[in-house]
Amino acid sequence: TNTAVGYDALVAATGASNTAMGSDAGGSVTSGSNNMFLGFHAGLSGSPGGAITTGSNEIVLGDENITEAHVQVDWTVASDQRDKTDFTALDLGLDFVKALAPVTYKWDKRSKYGDKTSEGYDLNAQTPDGTHKEDWLDIGFKAQEVEALEIAAGYNKSSKTNLVSSHTGDGKQMGLQYSKFVPILVKAIQEQQTLIESLTARITTLEG
């Protein structure tokens, strides 16, 4: 059983236990199950998660026009040691961080240039030319560049551990899981501190 509220919400769904609220919310999902879509066009091509068709156990909030998200407190992410196993030390650190290229940019969404299809918007209809770009600056990384660094480092293991998330099977919509950068940054700081302490000790010896 699916639950849908809104025009064409879950219109093509054959899977079960999907929930959608909003016009066209979850409109592209077919055999996918246990998904949640909240807001206008949530889950269509161009939305934050791309077009979800056969995917399951996913949550999508809103479409590509969302500019802010508000919550009173921080998200709490499950991290109980008792629910984990096969621990190994993370080997991505300072060298990986040094290779990252932070940038400022303006969004120029492909969905603004394409026609609406049954799965959302045709993201390959036209090449963005700047006529629909936003007038505000954002900061971050380019997903394709981070993916190349992941692959080079041998870290591109699975969609659940990768820094880069390609939400659709055809790779039309790529994103970054920024919270996963935190352990890497911690490792980089630790490596840098070890180097600083080593150099400080050498200087002390030379000066002594």
Residue ranges and their predicted role:
Residues 1-80:
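Glycine- and small/polar-enriched repetitive beta-structure motifs of secreted/surface proteins
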Residues 79-208:
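Intramolecular chaperone/auto-protease modules of tailspike-like proteins
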